[in-house]
Structures are given as C-alpha cells and as structure tokens.
Amino acid sequence: MNTTASVRRRTLAAAIAALALTTVGAVPAAAVDSSASAAHPQAPGRGGAPGSSTAGYGENARLAYQKAVAVQVLRGVFERGDMTVVDRFVRPDYIQHNPLAPDGAAALKAFGTAWRQQYPDATYDIKRVISEGDLVLLHSNVVLTPGTRGIAAVDIFRFQGGKVAEHWDVLQDVPATTANGNDMFSTISRPQTEAPGPAYLTAYNKKLVTAFVERYLVKKDLSAIDTYVGPEYHQHNPYIPDGVAGAKAGLGAYYAQFPQLVATPKRVIAEGDLVAVHSHTVNVPGERGQAVVDLFRVRNGRIVEHWDVVQDVPETSANDNTMF
C-alpha cells in the first residue's frame, strides 16, 4: 500500500541513495559463515568451485544458503570492511539497480571501502529475510549515525550459480512520528516473530496477496480490503492510520487525489506467511513515479499486517538499468 496523498516521498540524500547494497543483518558473523557453509558445502570461497550450482542440496537448503550469503556479503562489506566477501560471493558482472551506484563487483568494493571510512559506526538491523526461487529480500533499519532514526530499506538480490548476480533496493527516511502509532519495522500480529511461517503456506499466501494487489492497487478497488484483510490489521506505513478503517480512509484519499495513478507490480517474493510485492507506481502521467515494496503478513487466510518502503525514482542513474 502506498502513502496518503498529503505526503510526497522525498528522494534520499545522495550519500544514502548511492548504497550499492543497503542492508546488513544483525546476525553473528560466525553463525552466518557456518550457515552458508552447512547449507551449501560448495559455497563460493568455501572449498568448492566458484559459481558452483546449488542443485542437489534440496530447496530448503538452497534458500537458507541464499539468505545466509546475502547477509554475509552485507555484513562483510558494510560492518567489517571485508571486501574479500565480494570476491567470494558476488559475480564480477553484478547488475546494480540502485540509481546512484555503478554496475559491477569492483564498484561495490570501492563503495564499501568509502562507506566504512565515512560511517564507521553505522548499524544495520535486519528485521526479516525471505527467499523464494533465486531471490532474497531483506527488510532493515539502517542507521548511519548512532542516535538517529535512520532509514527503512528493502534489498532484493538475485542469485545465479550460488553467487549474487543482481540487486534492487528501495530506501525511505524514517519519520519522527506516524499516523498509526506503530514503527516501520516491528511485528505486532501474533505470533510476534520476524521469521516467515511454514513453507507449505508459501504458494497459497502468494496467490492471495497477488490477487489482493491486483484489485486494491492496480484496479484501485477498495472493496478488496473487505475480502482479503483481517479485522485486526496492523499498519506500518507511517502516513496511514491503523486498522481496516484507516486503510480504507488513507487509500481512498490517495486514489481521489491521483485518479490517474498507474501501479505496475514487477515481482512478488513469498516465504511462509510473508509476501513482498515490488512495484512501480506513477501518480500522474509523465512523471517518473516511485519504487515501492509492500510487505504483507498473512495469517489464517487473511492479511493481518503491512509494512512498506517508498522511494522517488530519480531523473538520472549511475548505471544503465532502471530501478525495476
């Protein structure tokens, strides 16, 4: 779900938006190394040939490996300043969709080195990680300077041959106050865990959220809220009130102000009870629009919680790729 009409999303400062990869998990480095190795004995740099296939280890092990590697790369580059993780886990022809970051593994290493020099006390608090197919999504609070609110960040990584091949992200400043009293990161619905639910729920929940997004966002049909959203609905978009009534009021005002809104979902990533939708929204024809990631939690066949991150698409890009 996008923001209300009264709030225009601001493009983050160039130093923030230029992050080549912008989420690093609060997972002990040793645990991440161990997890990556155990899930994929021939992980790049762990004794196997670079680019070794993950086939043969089972789907669950492959997904666990991808999540562990994504966190390992980010922790290495942005918390420890260890650029060797890029050589081990990132393809040289790494494709970058962050509009202020160049393509390639070499560019990532250069940026990581500069990052550590400029923000030696930065923290990366990953709240939740999901993986489906060859994609991994991480939702994080990134704080460059201790004591500040930081930014909300979603990173999406595509894996190829056991290595990170491509990256998209969406970044948004964390505001001082919210319309619903909730922060942008916590889990309120029960059980209060950031981990995704059982894997057998993935296909059903992905289908449910995809249908919901098609109706409420693409077709702007607010009756979809009654069909798909549970009576206890927790909202983390800082500009929309809590609950079902808040969602209807906030989105109704947004659609009324922008009747020509066009929303185009680009990819859907699901694991267990968490489903993320990466979209391009354009409020007014001719505008560049916004990159949006909506993250939904589904419990007992109903959507019970929602987080999102929204970023304006800038005029220029340091690479030849779009944000999508």
Please provide the spans of the model-predicted regions.
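Secretory targeting and sorting signals
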Residues: M1-D33
